[in-house]
Amino acid sequence: MTKAELKELIDSWENLQYLVNEIVRNPDYYKLLIELAFYDTHPKSWRAAYLVDKINDKHPELLHPFLSAMINQVQIEKSPGKKRHFLKLISLNDLTEEQQGFLFNFCIETLKSGKEPAAVRVHAMQILQNIAVKEPELIPEILLIIEDEMENHLTAGINSRGKKLVAKLKKALDKI
């Protein structure tokens, strides 16, 4: 499959399950999918990010070689849909200290941003909680940020995820 063929197939929702199966059977196609998700400006290139997300559900090992590139891409990504998928995928993976350092600042800015949709901010909040689990000294700061967002920029998604994450962080703080 070529990138042009992938673009054509991705245009139709009816082809998405076929593409998932085809890419899982032929992991070389995964790189094409990643390139389309990261670098293409095609209006429906967010579907490539959606496919990466769906494939990750059953084959997370395919994403590992591209995780650092995804972390770099998320900081310049303009599409909220693609950014949401990228942050969700990042939140599901173990991160190096260097990746955590970058993402800590990025996710705080993203969470506090009134310009980002709630779905993007929720995944940024999840990444912050994941980092706090590995770096317990950050728990008080992250708790304050999440609670502030819940108080001042409340949406259903922020409230729902925020309550769960605050409870987990407070429980972790009690163990320190």
Could you say what each language-model-derived stretch is?
Residues M1-I176:
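Alpha-helical scaffold domains
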